Amino acid sequence: DPTMSRGLGDVYKRQVEEAYEVADAIERENWEDLKNELGDLLLQTVYHTQIAEEENLFNFNDVINQISEKMIQRHPHVFGEENRNKSASQQIKDWETIKAKERAQKNQTGVLDDVAINLPALVRSLKLQKRAARVGFDWPDILQVLEKIDEETRELVEAKQHLSQEKINEEFGDLLFSIVNLGRHLGVDSEEALKKTNRKFTERFRFIEDSISSRGLKLEETPLEEMEDLWQISKKALSN
């Protein structure tokens, strides 16, 4: 198999794709698709492990043993008799202590060191902010977060006026990061909120497409004003 002859770095993207397809099947509540996608994800796990074994890195038993040890270590309130009566707040403190020990074992001394770089950007932003907030680096109230968004918006407008694409990209990223922070203070997961909005946009745009095509017309030949009218109709038609 040519896939097996490639290095681990060549196939990890496929693993990520399969994980997203698993998540998609779960959100659609399509259990037949979920069964198939879990199989595809498992296949990628086996692929990675086989490649690692051929390169004398580790084998499947090592993987199983590692996750078993991690589960026991991370959940003493489940696997340890003496820890089962601890309060939720104490369990959280214990969790932070355990994670700190794990980071130390990996020579990760920084609070943010083990936040995976390849996470989706919105997900990683939220994790970074939560991790920083745990050690007190956080705005005390939402008003200051809103003021920060205003500041970043002004800086983005200024960058646009100077026609510096590099600066525009930087300031736009800062604005997005601040919006994720606002969501965190409101108890909103930005990734999930945006996914919901994407689905809503898709449904409404399909309504426009179907309405126009049912009259034998083409989208690109339809005036913007008419598409906007259909958009407003779709909001009411799809609200139930």
Describe these PLM feature segments:
Residues 1-12:
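Single conserved hydrophobic/aromatic residue that forms the stacking wall/gate
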Residues 15-23, 31-53, 61-68, 145-159, ...:
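An amphipathic alpha-helical micro-motif enriched in hydrophobic residues
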Residues 54-123:
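Charged mid-protein connector segments
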